[in-house]
């Protein structure tokens, strides 16, 4: 796919409400207008903002796959500001990040909590960042189910399986022992940027652009 290929429109943030700035580019072929997020996508920048849910996850996955097709060797930059959300939606993003050829650099802007923190930690080693006043939080998955006792038991086993799997992923990316992860995710564990670096959740707190890759 060529560098001049169609750049897909990014409607998720626009749909969240408010006006999205437009950028007009001029060339010998005339003018072309982009919403700001589609223009940033041309620079291989993806925004993951708000609750992690199926629609948003599908858009992020589509953008990751598109940028891989554009250039499988060049890094992708994923900016995260999310309180977390659906485990299955988040895992679709995580698995795609690990699946594609380009390195995915992750940066927390604001907050990366719950599934947002796992996606932040799942970035390419050495390329996981946050801004100075960002907050990160890890915890165990939340679940609630009503129904027959046998169905409740089935769902309880599934939640415990998901909890163990998420802990294994965090242990892999942070370098922390699995028992430490299990202890720390038993309740909400908030971290500053410096604390997240020490924990292994990220690699560096960015204060200026030239500190990033």
From Swiss-Prot:
Gene Ontology CC entries for this record: cytoplasm; endopeptidase Clp complex
Pfam (any one): CLP_protease
Keyword Cell division in record: no
Signal peptide: none
Catalytic activity: Hydrolysis of proteins to small peptides in the presence of ATP and magnesium. alpha-casein is the usual test substrate. In the absence of ATP, only oligopeptides shorter than five residues are hydrolyzed (such as succinyl-Leu-Tyr-|-NHMec, and Leu-Tyr-Leu-|-Tyr-Trp, in which cleavage of the -Tyr-|-Leu- and -Tyr-|-Trp bonds also occurs)
Keyword annotations: Cytoplasm, Hydrolase, Protease, Serine protease
EC numbers, comma separated: 3.4.21.92
GO molecular function terms noted in the UniProt entry: ATP-dependent peptidase activity; ATPase binding; serine-type endopeptidase activity
Subunit comment: Fourteen ClpP subunits assemble into 2 heptameric rings which stack back to back to give a disk-like structure with a central cavity, resembling the structure of eukaryotic proteasomes.
NCBIfam families registered for this protein in UniProt: clpP, PRK00277.1, PRK12553.1
Cited function: Cleaves peptides in various proteins in a process that requires ATP hydrolysis. Has a chymotrypsin-like activity. Plays a major role in the degradation of misfolded proteins.
PANTHER family: ATP-DEPENDENT CLP PROTEASE PROTEOLYTIC SUBUNIT
Name by which UniProt lists this protein: ATP-dependent Clp protease proteolytic subunit 1
Species of origin: Pseudomonas aeruginosa (strain ATCC 15692 / DSM 22644 / CIP 104116 / JCM 14847 / LMG 12228 / 1C / PRS 101 / PAO1)
């Amino acid at each position: 796919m060529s560098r001049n290929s169609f750049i897909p429109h990014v409607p998720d943030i626009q749909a969240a409400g408010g006006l999205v700035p437009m950028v007009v580019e001029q060339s010998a072929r005339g003018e072309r207008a982009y919403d700001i997020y589609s223009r940033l996508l041309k620079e291989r920048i993806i925004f993951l903002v708000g609750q992690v849910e199926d629609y948003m996850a599908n858009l992020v996955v589509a953008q990751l796959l598109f940028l891989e097709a554009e250039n499988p060797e060049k890094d992708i930059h994923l900016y995260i500001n999310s309180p977390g959300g659906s485990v299955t939606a988040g895992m679709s993003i995580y698995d795609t990040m690990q699946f594609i050829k380009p390195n995915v650099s992750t940066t927390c802007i604001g907050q990366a909590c719950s599934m947002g923190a796992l996606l932040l930690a799942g970035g390419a080693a050495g390329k996981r960042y946050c801004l100075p006043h960002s907050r990160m939080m890890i915890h165990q998955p939340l679940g609630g189910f009503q129904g027959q006792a046998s169905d409740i038991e089935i769902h309880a086993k599934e939640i415990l399986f998901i909890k163990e799997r998420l802990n294994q992923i965090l242990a892999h990316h942070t370098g922390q022992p699995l028992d430490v992860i299990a202890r720390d995710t038993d309740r909400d564990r908030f971290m500053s940027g410096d604390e997240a670096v020490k924990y292994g959740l990220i690699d560096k707190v960015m204060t200026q652009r030239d500190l990033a890759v």
